[in-house]
A protein has these predicted regions:
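A conserved beta-strand-loop-helix scaffold within acyl/acetyltransferase catalytic domains
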Residues: 11, 16-36, 41-59, 166-214
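Conserved acetyl-CoA-binding loop-helix of GNAT-fold acetyltransferases
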Residues: 61, 67-83, 220-235
Length: 280
C-alpha cells in the first residue's frame, strides 16, 4: 500500500469516501492506495492550527484493509508531509472508551504520546430517557443539513461571517461540514430568515456524537433546545436504541441534557489529546 497527497489530479479516486468539498476544506489531504488493485482504501484530513501544528480532523480506513497497514501508511505519509512543510507537531483529539482501546494503541505505536492533562469526561444519554416538551418561545425554523442546498449553504456561510459572534469555533464547524452526519445535524433560522444556530453530529452505530452547538440571537438557549428536539425526534426514527454522547467541555448542552433526562447521563468515554512531535 502506498500513501499519497490527494490533489485535484487524483482526487476522483478518493471522493467516494468523503464529500466533494473535503479537498478544498483540508490543508493536508492524504490517501492510501492498494497498488495491486489501484483501489483507494483510506483517507486522512488534517488542518493547520496554531504555530506550526497539524491537527488530524478525520481519518477513515476501509473495513477490509484495517490491521493490514493502511492506517499506518496514512500516518507515515502525514509525518513525512509534516516534516517537509516544517511543522513542529501533529495532534489528534479523539473520544476513547474508558480503559485501553485499539485505536489509541495504534496512535501510540506510531510515535504519538497522550497528553496527561487532556482526558475530559464524555457522557452518554439514552434518547429513550429524554422527555421533550413544546416551548411557546420556540420560533426558529430548524432543518437538517441534508436538506440545505449548496446555494443556501453558501448564503448561510456569508451570513455567519457577518455575525459579531463569528469566531474560530464557527469557522471550524463550517470548514469541517463534510465530515458531519448531515441527516442528524441541523441549522436554525429565525422568524426573519436569519441564521440563528447550528448543531453538528457524527455517528458510530447507535452512538450520536454531539460535536458542537452554536446559537445566537435573543434567546440562544431556546434555539439550542429546538435543534436538540429535532435531533431527538429524527434519531428516534432512524437509529435503533440511539444514544447521544457529549463531552464535558460542552457544558451548555450537558446542562440541557441533564435537564431533559433528569440527570441520567453516564460517563462512557473520555476525550484525549494525542501528540506527535517532529524532530528538530
Amino acid at each position: 500500500m502506498t500513501g499519497t497527497l490527494i490533489t485535484e489530479d487524483n482526487a476522483e479516486l478518493f471522493m467516494g469516501a468523503v464529500g466533494t468539498n473535503a479537498l478544498v476544506n483540508s490543508d493536508v489531504f492524504i490517501g492510501v492506495v492498494d497498488e495491486e488493485t489501484d483501489t483507494a482504501c483510506g483517507v486522512l484530513s488534517a488542518e493547520a492550527v496554531g504555530d506550526r501544528t497539524l491537527a488530524i480532523r478525520w481519518i477513515y480506513v476501509d473495513e477490509s484493509r484495517r490491521r493490514k497497514g493502511a492506517g499506518r501508511e496514512l500516518i507515515n505519509t502525514l509525518q513525512d508531509v509534516a516534516s517537509e512543510i516544517g511543522a513542529g507537531a501533529i495532534v489528534c483529539s479523539r473520544n476513547k472508551p474508558l480503559g485501553k482501546d485499539d485505536v489509541t494503541e495504534f496512535f501510540l505505536s506510531c510515535g504519538f504520546v497522550q497528553d496527561e492533562f487532556s482526558p475530559t469526561p464524555v457522557y452518554s444519554y439514552k434518547i429513550s430517557d429524554i422527555s421533550l416538551r413544546d416551548i411557546k418561545k420556540e420560533k426558529d425554523q430548524v432543518m437538517p443539513l441534508d436538506e440545505v442546498s449548496i446555494k443556501d449553504w453558501a448564503e448561510m456561510e456569508n451570513a455567519w461571517k457577518e455575525l459579531e459572534a463569528y469566531d474560530e469555533r464557527l469557522l471550524d464547524i463550517i470548514q469541517n461540514r463534510e465530515f458531519y452526519d448531515k441527516n442528524l445535524s441541523f441549522a436554525a433560522m429565525d422568524s426573519e430568515g436569519r441564521f440563528s444556530g447550528i448543531l453538528v453530529t457524527s455517528t458510530d452505530g447507535q452512538i450520536i456524537y454531539l460535536e458542537d452547538v452554536f446559537a445566537v440571537g435573543d434567546d440562544p438557549g431556546i434555539t439550542a433546545y429546538a435543534m436538540l428536539k429535532s435531533l431527538v425526534l429524527r434519531a428516534d426514527k432512524s437509529v435503533k436504541d440511539p444514544v447521544i454522547s457529549v463531552s464535558y467541555e460542552n457544558k451548555e448542552m450537558l446542562f440541557l441534557l441533564d435537564k431533559v433526562t433528569g440527570g441520567r447521563g453516564v460517563q462512557t468515554e473520555e476525550n484525549i489529546l494525542l501528540s506527535y512531535f517532529m524532530d528538530v
